[in-house]
Amino acid sequence: MAASLPGPGSRLFRTYGAADGRRQRRPGREAAQWFPPQDRRRFFNSSGSSDASIGDPSQSDDPDDPDDPDFPGSPVRRRRRRPGGRVPKDRPSLTVTPKRWKLRARPSLTVTPRRLGLRARPPQKCSTPCGPLRLPPFPSRDSGRLSPDLSVCGQPRDGDELGISASLFSSLASPCPGSPTPRDSVISIGTSACLVAASAVPSGLHLPEVSLDRASLPCSQEEATGGAKDTRMVHQTRASLRSVLFGLMNSGTPEDSEFRADGKNMRESCCKRKLVVGNGPEGPGLSSTGKRRATGQDSCQERGLQEAVRREHQEASVPKGRIVPRGIDRLERTRSSRKSKHQEATETSLLHSHRFKKGQKLGKDSFPTQDLTPLQNVCFWTKTRASFSFHKKKIVTDVSEVCSIYTTATSLSGSLLSECSNRPVMNRTSGAPSSWHSSSMYLLSPLNTLSISNKKASDAEKVYGECSQKGPVPFSHCLPTEKLQRCEKIGEGVFGEVFQTIADHTPVAIKIIAIEGPDLVNGSHQKTFEEILPEIIISKELSLLSGEVCNRTEGFIGLNSVHCVQGSYPPLLLKAWDHYNSTKGSANDRPDFFKDDQLFIVLEFEFGGIDLEQMRTKLSSLATAKSILHQLTASLAVAEASLRFEHRDLHWGNVLLKKTSLKKLHYTLNGKSSTIPSCGLQVSIIDYTLSRLERDGIVVFCDVSMDEDLFTGDGDYQFDIYRLMKKENNNRWGEYHPYSNVLWLHYLTDKMLKQMTFKTKCNTPAMKQIKRKIQEFHRTMLNFSSATDLLCQHSLFK
């Protein structure tokens, strides 16, 4: 072994044989066990080691790490001679100061103890979070709390490719003694994620109480969105309340948290706790958003995004006496670098080419396991996003349980709901009266007196009721042979498959979701009746807006029917699945493994057309883009007024376009009807996985407060929007913040101006004027508080 002194930035690695392989280890000799020094702390500065551990818990560079034999935590001295071993006399001793051990945080090999053998670690699966581990968003002093970090999860036990999605978002702790009883008015649906329970105020802690002046709170939705002054006042008050609440959560003990051992239910009740205004820390989840996975690309753009996120954290911790102007704060956002079209196409092809299918054997042409790491950097976000987005738990709660000033303020939508909710609506496809005549949100109200077994039966009955059935029916009941013969697969997701067919001479989309079965579907557990019920009702509520009077729009995809069927997958659908797989490539498992008793939910939607992303080069002109923005803004504004709705995931894959012969499209907002030039296209909004809505005192939302992977994406403005939403609502996703709709409209406008090309160039004065208006819309829209505010006040829609 060479005896030269290491350079200042070099790292000492232990070698397990002589250089050039001239001398090999004796096969029968065991290595002596390594003993750590008794007192390591006296040799080092405690701040250096703590900083290293905070920077990356997964690294072995910490000199105080007892598990790293290369850095024993004390100055290097002469090695202890092993029994029977030889040490060359001419080998000089090395003296290495602790300063040389301050290495840059980066992924490194973890050396296992020699007595355990030197077998190579198995490669990570594509769905395994890659990159350095992150600290939990809660302060580390509460050792009894679970770490919400998704990357600490190990490999899935089931062995499926996406099987990790079930373990990524489940809590494994059991309730501690003395835990408060969960509130029955909150239903936590699913096993995918967890809702952090607020900690109670310690008995010995006394904080000064400050009363809030009711005059400073908005009295209606109009006042909440009418001007910048009221908006700033609302946000400052909400920020004060939330900082106190997060301070109370941090001050609790491990016994204050509510967890269930099965990971299915974790609930909180925050409104019954006494709110006191104090200097609370940052909200949960805010401390770790600045940590981003190492992608292997050290570029100025990445450093710029890190700096932008760091500035957001500094802004979030501004003292309460300092007022940050709302408009200036939003206009100074930093946009991450976007991928080129070539990069996006390459990533998509890699994703489709190298996905391991369930039950397939690896042949000589299969993707080699040792090359998984570069692929993980390419498709990590795509697969992780898919693995949890369709299996998010929906939180169903009462309005009083959501501590939001927006919620407690008098809402115009409350009176409108009572006026417009009890009328029969027309089926968009057939024109006949629909089987469901009014809202079904009341079905989500918790039944406090039911036991677990009765609750499960009740959920099944509710689903059957929405399907107008008494029990499951065969596939042939809703998909007769002539309908199946015309089926063509058009999409897929972790939830299942989407097919297109013809019903009554009209194209429709069929979405098939497996439920209540023991088999993993595409690596994830199947949904239950309890989990699928909110999905059905949300789709129905937004579809019903097409038949309302006071607030009406056809901008959300129409839901024609829902059925619960039982049986194995029909052969004609398998044939359509095979054709899609051979032409486009499928990332899903072939659905041929279901038994005869398998249950499915079959949702029939109107056919919405092609998504905006695929139409990026096919639109005629910027006038069409203006019509699309107008339709989207109007649809979101109507949903805000009627359902206090936030979409929260309106990327350009969730905007569908189809041709229409109508010259103008009609909508009604707060009783006032208006029209929009269609330019030959009708827009439909889809995918309500992350959405939030409220009706009849019931709030349904998706809690993503602990899902750090949602906020660490990179390479597109879309991922900045998730972080901006989190900053806007202080990571409290049950509250109503219509500004999130403005953020997504800004994202779509950005796409149209920078990543879409049009057949007709801006050569005429009229086209140039439209382009200037859209550019002005892009520059100024972040100063508006909601889609309703944009629609009514911005000059683009005048």
UniProtKB/Swiss-Prot annotation:
Active site: 649 (proton acceptor)
EC identifiers of the protein: 2.7.11.1
GO biological process, one term: intracellular signal transduction
Modified residues (Phosphoserine): 58, 93, 143, 147
Mutagenesis or variant effect for residue 492 to A: Markedly reduced affinity for histone H3 and reduced histone H3 phosphorylation
GO molecular function (one): ATP binding
Binding, ATP: 490-498, 511, 606-611, 649-654, 687-689
Modifications after synthesis and translation: Autophosphorylated on both serine and threonine residues. Strongly phosphorylated during mitosis but this does not appear to significantly affect its intrinsic kinase activity. Phosphorylation by AURKB is required for full activity toward histone H3 at 'Ser-3' in mitosis.
Organismal lineage: Eukaryota, Metazoa, Chordata, Craniata, Vertebrata
Cell compartment(s), UniProt: Nucleus; Chromosome; Cytoplasm, Cytoskeleton, Spindle
Required co-factors: Mg(2+)
Start and end residues of each stretch annotated as Disordered: 1-110, 275-350
Name assigned to this protein: Serine/threonine-protein kinase haspin
Entry's family note: Belongs to the protein kinase superfamily. Ser/Thr protein kinase family. Haspin subfamily.
Modification Phosphothreonine, positions: 97
Effect of residue 511 to A: Strongly reduced enzyme activity
Cytoplasm is among the record's keywords: yes
InterPro entries named among the record's database cross-references: GSG2_C (IPR024604), Kinase-like_dom_sf (IPR011009), Prot_kinase_dom (IPR000719), Protein_kinase_ATP_BS (IPR017441)
Enzyme class name: transferase
Reactions the enzyme catalyzes: L-seryl-[protein] + ATP = O-phospho-L-seryl-[protein] + ADP + H(+); L-threonyl-[protein] + ATP = O-phospho-L-threonyl-[protein] + ADP + H(+)
Keyword Nucleotide-binding (UniProt): yes
Bilayer-spanning residue ranges: none
First-listed, main subcellular location of the protein, grouped into a coarse class: nucleus
